[in-house]
Structures are given as C-alpha cells and as structure tokens.
C-alpha cells in the first residue's frame, strides 16, 4: 500500500525536477527506519543523470518540504537515479552527499571488514565518517580504496 504522503511529495518534487529537465520516476517513504527515509528517484530522459542533478534536486526539494511541513518531523531525504554508481573524490562531493548511502571499500581489512555500508557523515584529513544503523564509524583515509554512492539503498 502506498503511503498517503507519496502523492503530495510527487506534486512537490515534479516541478522541481522538471525545471531542471528531469523527471521523477519513483518515490519511496520508508517509515520503518528512524528517522524515516524519503527516497526520490529521478532521471534525465535525454541523457545521463549526474550527481549534480541529484544534488540540485535534493537542495531544492529539502527546502520545499521543510517550508511546507508536509513531513511533520525529522526525516532523511535521498535523491538518487537508476545507474548512479560514481565514486566520491572531492571535498565538494563529500559535502554534497552527506546523508547519502555509501559503500566504503578499504585496501586491507579494518575492524575485520573490507567493505562498509552506511550513511555518509563527512570526511576530514584523517578519516571518512559514516553512520551504520545509528553507530558512528570513522574509517582511516589511508586505508580507503574508494567511496561510492550505494545505488541499492
């Protein structure tokens, strides 16, 4: 059954996407998570959907959702596109995609794992920080092989 807020969210997200030459292809509201996760999938029917497209829609939709108070409380907003699996490299990307689901792969096992999945919290000169099911994890940068968006979450 579709969550009752989905039609309202689609009505708010569609003009934002269309203003950028994009379309909303799916909206999922995961109320079983704390805070709830609102995922809006977008695509560019004329070509590839870029991370910049996702970032622009995320910033604009977040402002509209907060202003309209349709969400009624705290939530996590994720904007994604089928097929985005790009690695994050620049400080700008790490700032832009804070809160997004990522996969961090290490060169050697760190705390018995070579792959970490969680929500990106940030990066500094010493570590990449993720939130994994409410637990904060700092992964030393010198061990990291790559950080990429998790397209399956």
Swiss-Prot record:
Question: How is this protein annotated for GO cellular component?
Answer: cytosol
The cross-references to Gene3D superfamilies, in alphabetical order and at most eight, read: RimP-like superfamily, N-terminal (3.30.300.70)
Give GO BP annotations, semicolon-separated: ribosomal small subunit assembly; translation
The UniProt entry, under Pfam families, shows: RimP_N
**Principal place of residence:** cytoplasm
Which cellular compartments is it found in? Answer: Cytoplasm
Keywords per UniProt: Cytoplasm, Ribosome biogenesis
InterPro entries, A to Z: Ribosome_maturation_RimP, RimP_C, RimP_C_sf, RimP_N, RimP_N_sf
Indicate whether Cytoplasm appears among the record's keywords.
yes
- Role summary: Required for maturation of 30S ribosomal subunits.
PANTHER family in UniProt = RIBOSOME MATURATION FACTOR RIMP (PTHR33867:SF1)
Q: Which family does it belong to?
A: Belongs to the RimP family.
The protein in question is named Ribosome maturation factor RimP
Organism encoding this protein: Rippkaea orientalis (strain PCC 8801 / RF-1)
